[in-house]
Amino acid sequence: MTIEVLKERIPDFAKDVRLNLSSMASDETLGEQTKYGLLVATAIATRNVEVIAAIEAEAAGKLSPAALGAAKSAAAIMAMNNVYYRFVHLASNKDYATMPARLRMNVIANPGVDKADFELWSLAVSAINGCGMCIDSHEKVLLQAGVSTAAIQTAVRFAAIMQSVAVSIEAGAASLAVAAE
């Protein structure tokens, strides 16, 4: 499965989503590794098997094994960190912010790819997962590394599109299941 096949799976009620996916696929704002790592990380964050399979197929040959692994690591480590740090951020009791997290996250310091790419992927996954504290932290690191606000916005736009693709496909499948009853 590829992005083209994925587009065909998007129901007509989500035509805008289909068009956004087409625009994202042809967007050349980001470098190849940055873009395809971003697509893989955000696809994984949607938790939709069809989306993940299509994006991984699309990324095949465009990402080195190290970059593919790093993109998957970004999604995995953010799945943990986004829950923990969203709690720390939202809890009324601010004592939690002073406590050690006691979570292993060595991959952040040594992702095996360009640090800015990994941070951008982590920021996009954090946007999907809704962790404001993580978003702020990754944005700060990216800006210090010289990544433009336009590139950051592109990453978050891609995350938004990827999430909407997953939701649209799931909504279409649910509609078909109901119609079949």
Swiss-Prot record:
Q: What does this protein's UniProt record list under function?
A: Antioxidant protein with alkyl hydroperoxidase activity. Required for the reduction of the AhpC active site cysteine residues and for the regeneration of the AhpC enzyme activity.
Q: Which Pfam families match?
A: CMD
What does the record give as the active site?
A: C131, C134
Q: Which UniProt keywords apply?
A: Antioxidant, Disulfide bond, Oxidoreductase, Peroxidase, Redox-active center
Please name the GO terms of the biological process aspect recorded for this protein, alphabetically.
cell redox homeostasis; response to oxidative stress
Reactions it catalyzes: N(6)-[(R)-dihydrolipoyl]-L-lysyl-[lipoyl-carrier protein] + a hydroperoxide = N(6)-[(R)-lipoyl]-L-lysyl-[lipoyl-carrier protein] + an alcohol + H2O
Gene3D superfamilies per the record?
A: AhpD-like (1.20.1290.10)
PANTHER family from the xrefs? ALKYL HYDROPEROXIDE REDUCTASE AHPD (PTHR33930:SF7)
UniProt KW Oxidoreductase keyword: yes
What family is this? Belongs to the AhpD family.
Q: What is its EC number?
A: 1.11.1.28
- Could you state a single Gene Ontology molecular function term? hydroperoxide reductase activity
Taxonomically, the superkingdom here is Bacteria
Query: This protein is called what?
Result: Alkyl hydroperoxide reductase AhpD
Using the chain's own numbering, where are the disulfide bonds? C131-C134
- HAMAP family per the record? AhpD (MF_01676)
Matching entries from InterPro entries are given as: AhpD (IPR004674), AhpD-like (IPR029032), AhpD_core (IPR004675), CMD-like (IPR003779)
Q: Which organism is it from?
A: Rhodopseudomonas palustris (strain BisA53)
